Design a protein with these regions (language model features):
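General structural signal for secondary-structure boundaries
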Residues: 1, 20, 53, 84-85, ...
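Short acidic/histidine-rich active-site segments
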Residues: 1-14, 18-19, 27, 33-40
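C-terminal non-catalytic regions of proteins with extracellular/luminal or membrane-system context
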Residues: 5, 11-12, 18, 43-58, ...
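Conserved short secondary-structure transition element at the edge of the structured enzyme core
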Residues: 21-33, 66-77
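Residue-level signal for secondary-structure boundary elements
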Residues: 36-37, 59, 76-80, 116, ...
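Conserved, charged catalytic cores of large soluble enzymes
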Residues: 44-45, 66, 70-89
Length: 357
């Protein structure tokens, strides 16, 4: 039995059910916890002191140690303690796992709105514009507790020290700060993900393979967060020249101040981040056949988009084969679900939302 990160610490602060870390460690061990993550704060030298003064028995410690060692024996870690990278890599990109990834993505998509028979799109469409902050970003396909999100956080700290008073130091208890401009995905990160997830395709990349005879154009327009609109005119011009516009919106799911939602991130707003609504209004003013695709780790609510655009597809983070799966949904090779797994509030005033509502 292992703890959540800093769960033992939290018995002291903020929950205040233990007077100090020693008591927190003792109570956790006696309750059946075997390993404390991410570092020993309750399960530290304090355990030795607790045994010596009688607050903890060796039997309690022996039980935790025995369970950990038993698992290691079952896994063969004493005989062969090192991972075999060649075997691990061979497991990553098998046909069966690719098919499962695509199946999971297809089953996760939710058709929120489809008026005037906007979807499915015709495979004979000649010119398609793919715009918005998630149109050609692999990072958008992966959620908080994925390798790409962890890599994003690590690179952010390495490159510019966001979240740290002293760049380069390893700081565990980070006081989260929310700057006016969150970090967008760096080109370096995207190159790394493309190399390590060779079969992963963004929507823009997947469309070019799915419809080789169509003209697929792309312009990002704006970042998911921040106030920079310098690229919006290019995106609007790209959309204006297309027969169909695929408009990606949504936040960024990850760790801390690299993201708008995820681990260590709280929000008082359920609307689109940054200046995405302003962008959406400009896209709508073009009066083009448009499909809105919402990438995110949580449901958002925006009255303008909900009431003005004819087709809205909830994409979430569809994973490694998400781009290919999106093509199948958009062009009628797969029929998406219409059921939400969570309640989406219409406005922030409805929150907290209870199951009884």
């Amino acid at each position: 039995v292992v703890s959540d990160y800093v769960a033992v610490d939290r018995l002291v602060d903020p929950f205040q059910v233990a007077a100090d870390y020693t008591e927190a460690g003792i109570r956790s061990l006696k309750a059946g916890l075997d390993v404390e993550y991410p570092r020993p704060k309750g399960f530290s030298y304090r355990m030795k002191e607790a045994v010596e003064d009688g607050r903890l028995s060796m039997a309690d410690i022996d039980q935790a140690v025995e369970r950990v060692l038993t698992q290691k024996v079952k896994l063969g870690l004493f005989e062969d303690p090192y991972p075999h990278l060649d075997r691990l890599k061979a497991l990553l990109h098998q046909k069966s796992t690719d098919e499962l990834n695509e199946k999971m993505a297809l089953e996760s998509f939710i058709l929120l709105k489809n008026e005037r028979k906007t979807l499915p799109l015709s495979k004979k469409t000649k010119k398609i514009a793919v715009i918005g902050p998630h149109a050609d970003v692999l990072r958008s396909y992966f959620g908080t507790f994925s390798y790409p999100a962890a890599l994003d956080m690590t690179m952010a700290r390495e490159e510019d020290g966001q979240g740290f008073d002293e760049p380069g130091l390893i700081v565990y208890d980070i006081e989260q700060k929310y700057p006016g401009q969150l970090r967008d995905c760096s080109p370096r990160l995207e190159r790394r993900l493309q190399a390590e997830f060779a079969k992963c395709r963004t929507l823009y990349q997947a469309l070019k393979e799915y419809l080789p005879d169509a003209e697929i154009t792309y312009a990002k327009g704006i970042n998911a967060v921040g106030s920079d609109l310098s690229g919006m005119e290019e995106a609007l011009n790209t959309a204006a020249e297309a027969d169909v516009v695929l408009f990606t919106i949504g936040g960024k799911n990850g760790w801390g101040i690299t993201s708008t939602v995820g681990e260590g991130v709280d929000s008082t707003n359920i609307d689109l981040p940054g200046r995405q609504e302003e962008f959406a209004r400009a896209v709508y003013a073009l009066h083009k056949k448009t499909v809105v695709l919402h990438f995110d780790g949580r449901p958002l609510s925006n009255a303008f988009i909900a009431s003005h655009f004819d087709a809205i597809l909830e994409v979430w983070q569809p994973g490694m084969m998400g781009g290919q799966a999106l093509c199948k949904v958009l062009f009628g090779d797969y029929n998406p679900a219409g059921r939400l797994p969570v309640t989406a509030a219409r406005s922030v005033g409805q929150i907290p939302v209870y199951y009884a509502l």
